[in-house]
């Protein structure tokens, strides 16, 4: 049984897509979220896909989030996709993320300190009909700011700097 207090979250977003010529597609997203006992969080994200050739696509992504009194996040990424055959695609990617740390409304919590992270990936995508399978390998590096709240030092091992290999497999079936 869940007891009070509850944390309710309400959010809304506006998303629009634009096609520029026959080789550029953009998508912009603006979102506002509100969690009980906190200020609104405003987020903006911009995605671009540029067809460099018939088989080579460059994708760019950038975003920002802001919540008073002191949370800010910035993120971005770039990937290059090459269509080897009509069913197979190879991607190289890089993502970067930075924030100032979690905002909390309570005294004792697991609020994360500021974070800088980066990920480098290579993936292969197989598509046929309404089915696709993607396998990827990457290197992920996270660098946390020091924990400054003495009540959160119990979580010091959770928020320590790490570098590790990531592996993902995703299966998608559209119907």
What are these model-predicted stretches?
Residues 1-175:
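Gram-negative and organellar
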């Amino acid at each position: 049984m869940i007891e009070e207090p509850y944390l309710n979250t309400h959010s809304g977003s506006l998303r629009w897509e634009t096609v520029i010529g026959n080789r550029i597609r953009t998508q912009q997203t603006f979102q506002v979220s509100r969690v009980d006992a906190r200020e609104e969080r405003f987020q903006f994200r911009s995605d671009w896909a540029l067809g460099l050739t018939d088989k080579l696509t460059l994708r760019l992504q950038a975003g920002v989030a802001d919540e008073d009194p002191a949370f800010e996040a910035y993120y971005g990424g770039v990937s290059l996709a090459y269509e080897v055959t009509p069913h197979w695609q190879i991607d190289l990617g890089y993502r970067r993320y930075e924030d100032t740390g979690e905002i909390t409304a309570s005294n004792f919590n697991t609020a994360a300190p500021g974070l800088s992270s980066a990920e480098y990936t290579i993936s292969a995508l197989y598509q046929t009909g309404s089915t696709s399978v993607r396998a990827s390998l990457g290197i992920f590096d996270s660098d946390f700011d020091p924990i400054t709240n003495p009540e959160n030092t119990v979580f010091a091992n959770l928020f320590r700097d790490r570098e590790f290999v990531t592996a993902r497999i995703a299966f998608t079936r559209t119907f």
